C-alpha cells in the first residue's frame, strides 16, 4: 500500500468509525471498488488506533472524571456509569477474541456486506423512529448498558457498524440521541484499544512504514472531526441521513458484486 492509499484509508476510517455506516465495511469495500492493495485486518485495526487517539482526545475530560469516580465505587452516577462501561465491554472482547479468524476469512464478502448495510440501516431507522427520548447519559442503567454491550459484539461483522448497532440499541432502550452517541463513543474506547493492542502484538514490524503512519495520523484527525460532527448533528436531527446513505451504498455494492460475479 503506497502513501496515497494509506492517507485515503485513514480518511475512510476516520469518517466511518464514528458515523453509523460501518468502518469495517468501508475498509473492505474501498480497496475492492478502487483496486487498492487489500490492507487486511491488521491494518484495519491499526487505523482504529488512530481513531482511538481521536476519541481519547475528544473525551479526555469525560474519561478523567469517570475513572476518578469509578475508583471510588458505584456511589455516584459517574461511578456507576464507569463500571457499566467496563461490564458492557466484556461481550465485545469475548466475541472478538474467539471469532476474529472466522470474520477475517469468511465474512468480508462484498455481497454480504451490501446486504448487511441495508438491513442494519433498517434497524437504525426503526430504532430511531420508535425509540424514546427519555434517558440522558447518567440515567443509563445496568440493563441498558448490558443490552448495548451485547449488541456491540455483533459489530465484528463488516456492514453492521459498531456505532450504528450500539446507538440503535440505546435508542430502543429509551436513550436520547445525543446521550446514545456519547455512550457509544465512550464504549468504543476500551474495545478499540483492546483490539488494536492484540493485533499490534502480532503485527510484522515491516508494516510500520510511511503509509502505515500516514494512515493512522489521518484517521486520528478525521476521526476527531467526525465525532464533533455527529454529536452536533444528532442534537438537532435524526439518523435518517445515515440510513439513506447505508441503503444507497448497500444497493450499489450488491449491483457491482453481482455484475462482477
UniProtKB/Swiss-Prot annotation:
One of its GO terms (biological process) is response to antibiotic. It is found in: Cell membrane. InterPro entries: UppP. It comes from the Bacteria. Keywords: Antibiotic resistance, Cell membrane, Cell shape, Cell wall biogenesis/degradation, Hydrolase, Membrane, Peptidoglycan synthesis, Transmembrane, Transmembrane helix. Coiled coil: none annotated. It is an enzyme of class 3 (hydrolase). Its main location: membrane. Its EC number is 3.6.1.27. It catalyses: di-trans,octa-cis-undecaprenyl diphosphate + H2O = di-trans,octa-cis-undecaprenyl phosphate + phosphate + H(+). It is a multi-pass membrane protein. It holds the Pfam family BacA. GO terms for cellular component: plasma membrane. The chain crosses the membrane at residues 16-36, 40-60, 82-102, 107-127, 140-160, 183-203, 211-231, 239-259. GO terms for molecular function: undecaprenyl-diphosphatase activity. The keyword Membrane applies. Belongs to the UppP family. Bacitracin is thought to be involved in the inhibition of peptidoglycan synthesis by sequestering undecaprenyl diphosphate, thereby reducing the pool of lipid carrier available. PANTHER family: UNDECAPRENYL-DIPHOSPHATASE (PTHR30622:SF4). Catalyzes the dephosphorylation of undecaprenyl diphosphate (UPP). Confers resistance to bacitracin. This is Undecaprenyl-diphosphatase. It comes from Desulforudis audaxviator (strain MP104C). The lineage of its organism: Bacteria, Bacillati, Bacillota, Clostridia, Thermoanaerobacterales.
Amino acid at each position: 500500500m503506497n502513501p496515497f492509499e494509506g492517507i485515503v484509508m485513514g480518511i475512510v476510517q476516520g469518517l466511518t468509525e464514528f458515523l453509523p455506516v460501518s468502518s469495517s465495511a468501508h475498509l473492505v469495500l474501498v480497496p475492492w471498488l478502487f483496486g487498492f492493495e487489500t490492507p487486511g485486518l491488521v491494518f484495519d485495526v491499526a487505523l482504529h488506533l488512530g481513531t482511538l487517539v481521536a476519541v481519547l482526545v475528544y473525551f479526555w475530560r469525560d474519561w478523567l472524571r469517570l475513572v476518578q469516580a469509578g475508583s471510588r465505587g458505584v456511589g455516584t452516577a459517574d461511578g456507576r456509569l464507569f463500571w457499566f462501561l467496563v461490564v458492557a465491554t466484556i461481550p465485545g472482547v469475548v466475541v472478538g477474541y474467539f471469532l476474529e479468524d472466522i470474520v477475517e476469512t469468511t465474512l468480508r464478502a462484498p455481497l454480504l456486506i451490501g446486504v448487511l448495510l441495508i438491513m442494519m440501516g433498517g434497524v437504525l431507522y426503526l430504532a430511531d423512529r420508535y425509540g424514546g427520548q427519555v434517558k440522558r447519559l447518567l440515567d443509563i442503567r445496568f440493563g441498558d448498558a448490558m443490552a448495548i454491550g451485547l449488541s456491540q459484539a455483533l459489530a465484528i461483522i463488516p456492514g453492521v457498524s459498531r456505532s450504528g448497532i450500539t446507538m440503535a440499541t440505546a435508542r430502543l432502550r429509551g436513550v436520547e440521541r445525543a446521550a446514545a452517541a456519547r455512550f457509544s463513543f465512550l464504549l468504543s474506547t476500551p474495545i478499540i484499544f483492546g483490539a488494536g493492542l492484540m493485533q499490534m502484538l502480532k503485527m510484522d514490524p515491516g508494516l510500520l512504514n510511511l503509509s502505515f503512519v500516514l494512515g493512522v495520523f489521518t484517521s486520528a484527525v478525521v476521526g476527531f472531526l467526525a465525532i464533533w460532527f455527529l454529536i452536533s448533528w444528532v442534537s438537532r436531527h435524526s439518523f435518517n441521513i445515515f440510513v439513506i446513505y447505508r441503503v444507497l451504498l448497500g444497493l450499489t455494492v450488491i449491483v457491482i458484486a453481482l455484475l462482477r460475479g
